[in-house]
Amino acid sequence: RESGSMNGWLTEVKPPYDAKKLEEVKNFHITKAVETVTPKKCEIKPADEKEEFQIVLWDFGAKENIIRELTRRRCRVADLPAGTTAEEILAMNPDGIMLSNGPGNPEDNPEIIEEIRKITKAGKPMFGICLGHQLLAIAKGAKTGKMKFGHRGANQPVKDLTTGRVYISSQNHGYEVLRDTLPEGAEETFINVNDGTCEGITYHDMPAFTVQFHPEACAGPKDTEELFGRFIQMMRDY
């Protein structure tokens, strides 16, 4: 409780342990996490009913239910690898861009962050979840940090600062966007009720909003799934 989340080591070796090995465990850091979970090529997911919008899902390790939430709302989804460039995405002329969840430290993805920074200048509607929330924040000039204790589980309460309502959300992250570093034009819109950390941002200099939690959570909670409806309305208004 005093030291926060720490690395662990499962071993059959009996003590005393080698000091060098213990130091390696202590300093272990997962690298290139997104590369291990992103798709290798573009996959097209058709809308469930008559197509109304074409969406690019920038896939950093997306949960399948993100795609389901979009296709059931008449969206054709182009599921793209994390290494796709801003130029390639804009050439597809999507109605909106979805930044998915994914693993690891957001700051370990400088190339992706740079491509997101480029694409923000196009002014396309954007919706980010979890890692996508963090990556867009960094691209816009904010900073992230490792939490002493990450948020894990399907019972995390978040408060909508616009309405005052509290929702129960599903979360699985160990990094946070540091609210004191938010750039001009970025408004914190959700906070975690337990520890007060940033859980959502709306950008007033572009049509974009992001959340740290998972509104697409399957099998729930479903409290915030209507954020996908907000994204749809944003594209209609664009």
Regions inferred by a protein language model and the residue ranges of each:
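Hydrophobic anchor at the start of a short beta-strand
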Residues: 77, 126, 208
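General small-molecule cofactor/ligand-binding pocket signal
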Residues: 78-80, 145, 189
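Flexible loop residues that form catalytic
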Residues: 102, 206, 216
